[in-house]
Amino acid sequence: MSVQDYLSAVKIGKKEYHACVNKGTYPYLPVLEDIIDESSIDREVSLGSDQIPLRLVVGTCTAGRTTAFADNFMPILDWGTEFSAKWASLSDSQVNEGIRDDIKVYEYMNKFYVLEGNKRVSVLKYFKAVTVSAQVIRKIPKYSDDPDVKTVSYTHLTLPTIL
């Protein structure tokens, strides 16, 4: 079953990839290190482990894995790679016992970027899970006159409770 799930996920991923290309938008996962300059970060705060909404997991931290996924976290690599075998194995694990290990994410401006666990997120999104258990590190931006940054006050926020 896991091979069929992978091939189905790839079909979804490639459809999304081509839709993005046709619209002229970036077809891969957003990469946090391309979005922010570390010099714009005041500090990082560990928020520990919590359930986070998968709909707010929007990208990855580094560019290394991004081209394996369409921007909806579905895989786009053909079957027969080490990546596809690991994805299929995670799919079996999810069906048989559930994925139990926390992923690791950075939270920035109420969105989450995966540091460890991109394939787990992909599998969970494929199976339409609502949340994922994650170790969360918040990146707190330096004070800025940018209205997008000013609207988010990080001094008192906990994890978003938007489920």
Q: Where do the protein language model's features map onto the residues?
A:
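Short, charged/polar connector segments at secondary-structure boundaries
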Residues: 1-109, 115-119, 125-126
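A short, polar/proline- and glycine-enriched secondary-structure boundary/capping micro-motif
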Residues: 124-127, 145-146
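Ligand-binding loop in jelly-roll beta-barrel domains
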Residues: 129-131
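Long, charge-dense
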Residues: 134-149
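Acidic, proline/serine/threonine- and glycine-rich low-complexity intrinsically disordered segments
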Residues: 151-153
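Conserved small/polar residues in nucleotide/adenosyl-binding loops
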Residues: 155-161
